[in-house]
C-alpha cells in the first residue's frame, strides 16, 4: 500500500518578520515537480504585511502561534505518512516534525541550517530562530505547548555548523544536541548516515534552511537582500556549496526513509521587486 504524502504550503512571514518569506512559499509550490496523489494544503496567512509588534518578547507571538495551531489541525485531519513543507521561514517545520515524532517512535531529525534555531526570547525576538528549541520543549514558553511529544536531543543532528554565534553553540551544548562541523564548506552525508544507523533511527525528517548556502552560490537567501545593511551580530552567513547541499539531501533521500522534508527561507528578492513594480503600475488596478 502506497504511503500517503501531503504537501503543506505555509507562507508564514511573521515569525521571521519579513514579507519575502510569503512569496518564497508560493514560488516553491509552483516550481515543485507534481506528483499525482500528493494533496496540497495551504495554511492561510495574512498578506497585508503590516508592521509587527512584540508580545512577551516575541515578534507577532499570537499570530505565529495561531498559524502553527492551524497547521497542526490540518495535519491531524489528513493523518499522512509523509509530509513535504514549503515555507515560509523555519518555524514551518514545527507542526510537521512534531506530528512525525508522534507517528514514528524511531524518528531522527537532520537540521541543515546556518543557525541551529535553538534560541529563546531572551536571546532573540523572532520565532523562526526558536523552532528546534520548541520541538525539544525549550524555546518560546508558549509554542512548545503545541508539541504533544517533544524530541529528545539524541534524535537530532545539526548539520552545517560554520562557526556561528557563541550563544547558539552554548545552547546546543546545554540542550545536548549533536552537531557536525562543516569541512571545506561541504556537508558530510556519510557521517549523517553513520549517525542514523548508530542510533537505530528508521525514519528521517530533514529541514533545509536556504541560508546554509554561500549567498554567492545560491541567490535566494537572507544575505542577498538588496536593502541589507551591516550583517546583524546574530546572523551567521552560510558558506556551504550548493552542489554539496543538493548531493547531501539526494543521498539521504535514497538511503533512508525520508518521511518529512522542509524547504524554508527561500527568499525571492527579485520577485518582490517585480511585485513592487506591478503595485505601482496603474493597469494592474
Roles of regions detected by a PLM:
Residues 82-151, 155:
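Active-site histidine-anchored catalytic micro-motif
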Residues 117, 164, 269:
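Surface-exposed, flexible loop/turn segments at secondary-structure boundaries
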Residues 2-84, 92-104, 173-285:
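Catalytic cores of soluble, metal-dependent hydrolases
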